[in-house]
């Protein structure tokens, strides 16, 4: 019986996905590409996939309508793949990228409205050496251009790029979710890397777009066990979905069947492996902890905001909790509104006393073991407390919090403000520990709160959370970061209100500087030990320093100067005017804070650094077959006395002042074109080319 998919589609929901208003966790399996004529019956295969517990398939091509129809009948959604020629330098030969644009455009115009289609992967694992060759920023911009094209045609679909650890810095800014192909067979390493990727993903959902194990080199039982714990771990670590690679051992590159690996959970004859039964039994782990929470919301003149906040709390799932609203001398009827519309919520009205005092009064009235604070302009996610509760299962955790995400912009001003610096942000010491958690999303053990004296009432409108977290850290307590425990936090509605807020933050920083002078620099800016969260996915820019490893061969390559980027302007509002406004705000925001803090204005202009690297003197390519590869070329040069690069050098080898970068293009049919970029003298570059052409034979004897 067909399952209707026409009424709703999958959408992003903060760090997760939802369908028809309900949170969904994607359970996906890759399907194909297959040798010609196989499998025999797609209809039967799709029914088996659904019965095994998957709700979606990922394919590596743009499918025909028949496949989409079969998926719809089976109750499966489809993530299609734009398979284009990114196996060579598509910047030097832009026809490759142009062809991808034309193909995506034509396919979407024909198939974008199909009810089974959920999303598009616009690329998959562009080779790290080619990314290094073309430059991370231009490659990322090319990926972003494909996403932009697709979104303009089909804004209802999800768009992403399937990344992998060797280019984790290549995250497109405009993707709907971050996707990583991960093959880590150690559970602890897999867990740690997912936690890292949550912060690389920024505000958006994280999906494991491939995870698999070869049962040819491992036992069937080991494959089943590994896939079982990997999917369970991905769920526990708050990803938005998990993709098993792959459904079948049948696999082809072009028309050639691949027989030297068995990643499928069914064999080449269609028989189930033990992994199918393991995956069929998957269930989320229930919480074994029953911590009691009191949620404290402080408000002043919040009548236009607090209803949405309290209704969001009313939709909260999990164990019962108490809610206390502290009305800090409102003059707009806030207290009467809360009393009339939310009679089950405890309301405490006080004369105007300031935010810190209001929070302390709420804490004094609470009886639960954990105090959770949020603001009247926030709407906590329905799973907020459940996810915070898991953090407190660790007895060493004194406080915990998650991201505060801006809701989608409704106006151009909101679009600019949600992309501007200066919003309340968490600061991370590592992937799971925080130096600072904003007061709009922080929970703390009541005993610890009382032990350090709560919030300092000298801070009336802002800065109290910074002081509170620093005092927690100074007392030796751990602050945990929980990426899935998010609240929607409305930013200021206008640029005037936003800059007025920044002046208030600057005034608060005056008190912080007096109280914590060692935590500030000579110009009055806070000196954080960790990284300030900006909301955008971590991605390389033109001036980024990237750890590639010697000769660019590190399996995990990352940005060294990890300045966490801000969110991009929503594409619906991005135009020259909003780009100009954002550039202006990025100048005025720190200036406003500096004026309020120091009573002086100093705009943050810096003189661009002069380029240090000379231009290459020669580029050339040498094509070959039967073992001609980048690794082979590097071996030739190492044998000839060339020295390997350092971890962050933009070249691979050096000899006598001459440097060379090597990349490889896969031209198909077993043909590889090795690319060489040379710095130094023209004579040395020509000599290098002659040396390589002379040694081109892959049968050349090389030392071990």
Give the location of each predicted region.
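Active-site mouth of glycoside hydrolases
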Residues: 11-14, 18-175
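Aromatic-rich peripheral "rim/lid" segments of glycoside hydrolase catalytic domains that contact
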Residues: 245-292
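Short, acidic, metal-binding catalytic loop of nucleotide-sugar glycosyltransferases
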Residues: 311-320
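A conserved acidic beta->alpha catalytic loop
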Residues: 312, 327-336, 378
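Glycine-rich, basic loop-to-helix element that forms the pyrophosphate-binding segment
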Residues: 350-366, 428, 432, 440
């Amino acid at each position: 019986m067909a399952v209707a998919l026409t009424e709703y589609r999958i959408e992003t929901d903060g760090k997760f996905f939802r369908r028809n208003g309900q949170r969904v966790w994607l359970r996906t399996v890759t399907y194909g590409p297959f040798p010609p004529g196989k499998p025999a019956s797609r209809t039967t295969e799709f029914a088996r996939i659904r019965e095994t517990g998957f709700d979606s398939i990922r394919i590596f091509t743009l499918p025909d309508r028949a496949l989409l129809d079969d998926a719809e009948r089976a109750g499966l959604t489809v993530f299609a793949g734009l398979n284009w020629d990114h196996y060579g330098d598509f910047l030097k030969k832009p026809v490759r990228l142009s062809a991808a644009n034309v193909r995506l455009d034509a396919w979407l115009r024909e198939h974008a409205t199909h009810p089974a289609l959920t999303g598009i992967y616009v690329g998959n694992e562009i080779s790290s050496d080619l990314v290094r060759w073309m430059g991370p920023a231009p490659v990322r911009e090319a990926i972003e251009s494909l996403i932009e094209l697709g979104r303009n045609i089909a804004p209802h679909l999800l768009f992403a790029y399937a990344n992998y650890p060797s280019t984790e810095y290549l995250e497109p800014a405009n993707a709907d979710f971050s996707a990583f192909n991960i093959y880590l067979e150690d559970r602890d390493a897999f867990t740690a890397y997912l936690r890292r990727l949550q912060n690389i993903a920024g505000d958006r959902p994280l999906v494991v777009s491939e995870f698999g194990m070869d049962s040819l080199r491992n036992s069937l039982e080991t494959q089943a066990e590994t896939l079982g714990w990997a999917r369970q771990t991905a769920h526990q670590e708050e990803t938005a979905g998990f993709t098993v690679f792959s459904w079948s051992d049948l696999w082809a590159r072009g028309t050639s069947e691949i027989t030297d690996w068995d990643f499928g959970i069914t064999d080449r004859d269609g028989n189930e492996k033990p992994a199918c039964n393991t995956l069929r039994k998957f269930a989320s782990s229930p919480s074994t902890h029953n911590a009691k929470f009191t949620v404290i919301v402080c408000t002043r003149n919040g009548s236009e905001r607090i209803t949405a906040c309290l209704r969001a709390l009313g939709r909260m799932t999990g164990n019962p909790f108490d809610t206390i609203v502290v009305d800090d001398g409102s003059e707009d009827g806030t207290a009467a509104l809360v009393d009339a519309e939310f009679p089950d919520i405890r309301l405490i009205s006080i004369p105007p006393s300031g935010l810190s005092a209001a929070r302390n009064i709420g804490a004094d009235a609470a009886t639960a073991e954990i105090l959770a604070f949020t603001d009247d302009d926030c709407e906590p996610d329905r799973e907020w407390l459940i996810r915070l509760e898991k953090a407190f299962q660790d007895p060493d955790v004194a406080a915990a919090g998650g991201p505060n995400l801006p809701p989608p912009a409704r106006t151009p001003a909101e679009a600019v403000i949600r992309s501007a610096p200066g919003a309340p942000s968490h600061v991370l010491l590592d992937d799971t520990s925080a130096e600072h958690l904003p007061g709009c999303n922080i929970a703390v053990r009541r005993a610890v709160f009382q032990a350090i004296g709560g919030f300092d009432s000298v801070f009336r409108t802002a800065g109290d959370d910074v002081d509170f977290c620093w005092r927690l850290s100074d007392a030796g307590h751990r602050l945990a970061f929980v990426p899935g425990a998010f609240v929607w936090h409305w930013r200021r509605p206008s640029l005037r209100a936003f800059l007025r807020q920044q002046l208030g933050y600057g005034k608060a920083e005056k008190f912080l500087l007096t109280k914590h002078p060692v935590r500030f620099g000579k110009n009055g800016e806070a000196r954080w030990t960790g990284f300030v969260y900006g909301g955008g996915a971590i991605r390389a820019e033109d001036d980024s320093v990237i750890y590639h490893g010697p000769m660019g061969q590190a399996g995990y390559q990352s940005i060294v100067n990890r300045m966490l980027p801000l969110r991009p302007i929503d594409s619906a509002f991005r135009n020259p005017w909003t780009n100009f406004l954002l550039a202006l705000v990025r100048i005025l925001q720190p200036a406003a804070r500096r004026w309020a803090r120091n009573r002086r204005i100093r705009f943050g202009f810096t003189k661009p650094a002069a380029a240090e690297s000379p231009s290459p003197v020669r580029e050339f390519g040498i094509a070959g077959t039967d073992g001609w590869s980048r690794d082979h070329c590097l071996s030739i040069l190492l044998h000839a006395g060339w020295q390997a690069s350092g971890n962050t050098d933009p070249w691979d080898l050096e000899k006598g002042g001459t440097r060379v970068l090597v990349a490889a293009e896969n031209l198909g049919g077993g043909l590889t074109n090795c690319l060489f970029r040379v710095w130094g003298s023209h004579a040395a570059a020509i000599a290098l080319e002659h040396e390589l052409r002379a040694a081109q034979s892959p049968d050349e004897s090389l030392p071990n």
